[in-house]
């Protein structure tokens, strides 16, 4: 699965956007994945909860919320290899750290590849590939 820098949020409900990752996901699965990406409390506080409309291109939500919804959708999919392009963009430090911990947990179930310009110290085992020049491809 792939999560790019451009996030696709559709003019549908939160549940419908999430189920694009797994059409047969039940409400309990949706709540679990929302908890994983740090949006469960936000969704619970919405009057329509899972039926909250997100607006055209996600106009009813913030950029950080859109990124987390797209990530939640990806985590619902059965894919074992995830490629995330700048998944921490637009997130504050606390949100980045929470997302990092969630991704590390998910990595135990498959392969996680993160493309980023920003690295920070972590006690998690990771492999880093640094490209020496911008036009070098691996």
Model-identified regions with their sequence ranges:
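Helix N-cap at the start of a conserved alpha-helix in ABC-type nucleotide-binding domains
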Residues: 93-94
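ABC ATPase nucleotide-binding domain helical subdomain, centered on the C-loop/LSGGQ "ABC signature"
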Residues: 15-55, 101
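Conserved catalytic loops of ABC-family nucleotide-binding domains
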Residues: 102-116, 120-123
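Catalytic Walker B motif of ABC-type/P-loop ATPase nucleotide-binding domains
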Residues: 82-86
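ABC ATPase nucleotide-binding domain signature
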Residues: 2-8, 22, 57-58, 117-119
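A residue-level structural signal marking coil residues immediately N-terminal to beta-strands
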Residues: 78-80, 110
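Hydrophobic anchor residue at the start of the ABC signature
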Residues: 65, 71
């Amino acid at each position: 699965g792939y999560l790019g820098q451009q996030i696709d949020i559709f003019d549908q409900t939160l549940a419908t956007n999430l189920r694009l990752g797994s059409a047969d996901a039940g409400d309990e699965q949706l709540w679990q994945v929302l908890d994983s990406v740090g949006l469960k409390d936000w969704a619970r506080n919405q009057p329509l909860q899972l039926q909250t409309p997100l607006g055209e291109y996600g106009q009813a939500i913030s950029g950080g919320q859109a990124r987390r919804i797209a990530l939640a959708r990806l985590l619902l999919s059965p894919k074992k290899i995830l490629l995330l392009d700048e998944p921490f963009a637009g997130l504050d430090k606390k949100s980045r750290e929470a997302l990092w911990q969630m991704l590390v947990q998910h990595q135990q179930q498959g392969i996680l590849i993160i493309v980023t310009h920003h690295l920070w110290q972590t006690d998690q085992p990771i492999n880093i590939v640094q490209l020496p020049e911008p036009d070098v491809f691996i």
